[in-house]
Amino acid sequence: MNGAAAPPLLFQPLRILGLELPNRIVLPAMVTRLSGEDGFVNRAILDRYVRHARGEPGLMVLEAMGVHAAKSGPLLRASGDEYIPALRDLVAACRAVSPTRIAAQIIHFLKISRSGWRQTVGDLGRDEIARIVRDYGDAAVRIRDAGFDAVELHMAHAYTLSSFLSRRNLRRDEFGGRALEHRLRVPSMVLERVRERVGPDYPIGIRYDGEEAIKDGYSVADATVIAVRFARLGANYLSISAGGKFEDALHVKGEPLYPYTGYSGDRCMPSANYPDGLNVYLAEGIRAGLRARGLAVPVVTTGKIRTPELAESILRSGRADLIGMARQLLADPDWPKKVRGGHADRVVPCVYNNVCKALDERFHRVRCTLWRKRDLHAPEPPRDRSAPSWPDAATLRLSEIQGRVRVEWPDASAYGYMVLRREGTGPFVHIDSARGVALRFDDAGVTSGPRYEYEVVAYGLGGERSPPLGPAAIRLGGIHG
């Protein structure tokens, strides 16, 4: 959609209860690890979300905030009234630069240790369950009082409410076991409590798994029944994720268990080797089940959606109502503005190498590998929008290195480089990107036999593209003109 008009559905407004979103693009909650151990908003957190707001997604969901005062590392909290003033300042700062609507996600998580031990929902007593329900209600009121447009309840992945929903919840009472009605009980109590506390006119969203993606976990069939229950209890939108479970996580000795290291973690954050839109079918099935029962709750789909063409096709085909983009909007927060303005050809595309995920796994501050090394946030577009240019007589060099194709190019003083490849007479396809300091790329996705051609495009801070350098061609076993 290079230089084309903005997609008509993607930039239509959508109403959620009394809240109108200016477009259908959602920035889902992402861990940043930018706050202090005390859970307060600091300058880095404020700057990160103001930068996202400048890109103008329809809805921006702030990272999960603990509803309880347990030690959580550098994660935000909403567990006491003392957090409200700084949260209010963050909302005001974002509103000052953008029409984006702002929600906050709230979460309860169980205890884990470096030994690999973790608390489960089966360990919780009735008093503890009642406290969790109260904590969610209290935190939701704080979110409302801080000025957020909506609150989102975290019921996905490895955390407490998702663990109650899980088929792996083996409690032998009314809060678990084989009966879905029992597994729904605590999440339903939380939703009812939050609705009671925030009132009938305040939007409530729920983020939960469309499937657990683990052995003996629930599938989209259960997820549809869960959606119907949530809709009938007053949820105003449903944001569909997948996986992210402890059950198949890989434990590194001496480190706390991280729930995104197994296959279910791949399903939650699909990397480059998975197809685009991997999890859309989950939202599609859930939405169809809701509509069949006369329930019009909007459904958000997520999971490796990066192009306006794919986003628009999902909306047009009725597979979802809203498009969630996390890593793509981390790579380029200005995606919505660029696409709306007909400049999709200036988007800095996410390469889905999951460096951001690896940083979270190591408890480091989360950033994008495509940013300059000195940047803590995505750089602002420069006033000078001129594209990088290649040096005179620049050429693209290809060589075979142990079954891979090495692509090398000269320095164009660029923010980054896009590597494109085609096989035979097919179209050129973007296969990866590199920061401006990198001047080569090794392509491991090739085989002997076909003729491959490569081009490299340099891009500036605002995504402005140079003319392609190349093409240059190769077959494994030798270079061909």
Which functions belong to the PLM regions below?
Residues M418-G449, L461-L469:
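Recognizes extended acidic, P/S/T-rich segments that occur
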Residues M1-S389:
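Flavin-dependent oxidoreductase catalytic cores
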Residues A387-A414, S448, L461-G481:
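Pro/Thr/Ser/Gly-rich low-complexity, intrinsically disordered linker/stalk tracts
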